[in-house]
Every structure is written in C-alpha cells, then in structure tokens.
Swiss-Prot record:
The gene is thiG. It catalyses: [ThiS sulfur-carrier protein]-C-terminal-Gly-aminoethanethioate + 2-iminoacetate + 1-deoxy-D-xylulose 5-phosphate = [ThiS sulfur-carrier protein]-C-terminal Gly-Gly + 2-[(2R,5Z)-2-carboxy-4-methylthiazol-5(2H)-ylidene]ethyl phosphate + 2 H2O + H(+). CDD domains: ThiG. 1-deoxy-D-xylulose 5-phosphate binds at residues 167, 193-194, 215-216. It comes from Azotobacter vinelandii (strain DJ / ATCC BAA-1303). It is found in: Cytoplasm. Keywords: Cytoplasm, Schiff base, Thiamine biosynthesis, Transferase. GO terms for molecular function: thiazole synthase activity. This is Thiazole synthase. GO terms for biological process: thiamine diphosphate biosynthetic process. Pathway: Cofactor biosynthesis; thiamine diphosphate biosynthesis. Gene3D superfamilies: Aldolase class I. Pfam families: ThiG.
Length: 264
C-alpha cells in the first residue's frame, strides 16, 4: 500500500539533503562535544552565529570550522544577536566574505533580549535587501501566517516560524497557526525555536514541516550526544507519520475487531 502522501526530497537553494534535522553550534561545553553531538544527529546543515562564533574572523582563536568541516556539512551562517536590519545585512555580508562567496544564510532580527521574539518589521526590511543582494535567505519569523506569506513572496527560500520562544523548550505552542502557514506555503517551512525534547520535533514533522532547526534542546540536555541521536529518530518518525496519514480522532470508541463471527 502506498503512503497517504507522496514524499519529496528536502531541497534548499538547489541542493538536496537526506536529513531534515538542522542543528546549531552554541551552548555546548566545548568544541569536542559540539562535534560529537552534530555527528550523532545526522544533520547535514549546521548553523553558526557569526557574531558569536569564530569562523575565521578572529585569527589565533579556536575556529569552529576546524571541527565542523565545510566539505562535509553545509554551513548556515545566522544573524543571531542582531536587533536591526542594518546589523543583520552587515553580518550576512561578513559571512559571505569569510566563507568565500557563500550565499545561504539564516536571517533573524530580534525584538528584545527578554523574549528574543522576531522583530518582523526589521526582518522584512533585511530580507528585501538580502534577496536583492543575491543571498538565499532562510528566515526566522513569528507564527503569523501573513508575515510568512509576505516573506515567501519577497523571495526568501524558506520560512522558519518559531514554535516557542528561543531556548524555552516549551514545544509547539500554537500548532494551529503553523497549520495555516503550512497549508499556504509556497516554500519550505521549518520550525525554528521552542523544541525541548524529541516528541516536540516529532509533532512539528507530523504537522507537515519540511524540517526542524534546533540548538538548545540538544545542547542543554543532560546528555547532548544521546539527545542528538533521539532527535534524529524523532524527525524521521514524524516525517513517516505525516506521510502515512494519522487516523481520524473520534469522540467515541471504535472496536478494533469486527463483531461478525464472534464466538458465543
């Protein structure tokens, strides 16, 4: 029997990936733990906060690229720590210089330090500039379906609505908005932020997300490497469940076995 839905490759900027789990590089105790967790996750795309992580801009300091080989992983520079469109654009251009013309970036422009909620006005400004400048923009945004639509129409190659606030581990706080975004999507939709454990990642994939990006859920686990393995399997399970199509929810019970031929 064929699945309820047809699977399709996970493709970004013309490149296809086997793993639908994207991982961050912050908050680990050291670079070796970072390397082990990323390897255990099976991820092929690794995101890096350019303003906080040395990828060559600080000679003489430990370089993340010494343990995360760009020949093996797609490096996804992000603009974490930026609070204006101008800061974000400048950071992306720096990343392009450091990574020899690399065009794939993750845009995030934050509103304040307490919530780390996206500033959608500044995000829209930055996205417009970056797209015109030739970047392939994956964009962190709120779970507002209208903003997600506008970002896609602007030319962003993927929209990444938050599931919960960054670093909170609250899980999928508003699955209904995510469903609307997914139903209207013309570009890949990835959950970004809020995942706390494997079941959260599975739920995101069961909703129909193309992939999930996470950092804190792995790095803050008591055993980050083991959690990375759990997330790998959670993503795969959620995707398979979405393809299979879940049974409908019912108010009343329905017997698993037919009444015909019942022994009396």
């Amino acid at each position: 029997m064929s699945p309820a839905r047809n699977d399709k490759p996970f493709t970004l900027a013309g490149r296809t990936y086997a793993s639908r789990l994207l991982v961050g590089t912050g908050k680990y105790k050291d670079l070796e733990e970072t390397r082990q967790a990323i390897e255990a996750s099976g991820a092929e795309i690794v995101t890096v906060a350019v303003r906080r992580t040395n990828i060559g801009q600080n000679p003489g300091e430990p370089n993340l690229l010494d343990v995360i080989n760009p020949a093996r992983y797609t490096i996804l520079p992000n603009t974490a720590g930026c609070y204006t469109a101008e800061e974000a654009v400048r950071t992306c251009r720096l990343a392009r210089e450091l990574l020899d013309g690399h065009k794939l970036v993750k845009l995030e422009v934050l509103a304040d330090q307490k919530t780390l909620f996206p500033n959608v006005i500044e995000t829209l400004k930055a996205a417009e500039v970056l797209v015109k400048d030739g970047f392939d923009v994956m964009v962190y945004t709120s779970d507002d379906p209208i903003i997600a639509r506008q970002l896609a129409e602007m030319g962003c190659i993927a929209v990444m609505p938050l599931a919960g606030l960054i670093g909170t581990g609250l899980g999928i706080c508003n699955p209904y908005n995510l469903r609307i975004i997914l139903e209207e999507a013309t570009v890949p939709v990835l959950v970004d932020a809020g995942v706390g454990t494997a079941s959260d990642a599975t739920i995101a994939m069961e909703l129909g997300c193309e992939a999930v990006l996470m950092n804190s859920a792995i790095a803050h686990a008591q055993d980050p490497v083991l959690m990375a393995r759990a997330m790998k399997h959670a993503i795969e399970a959620g995707r398979l469940a979405w393809l299979a199509g879940r049974m409908p929810k019912k108010l009343y019970a329905s017997a698993s076995s037919p009444l015909e031929g019942l022994i009396r």
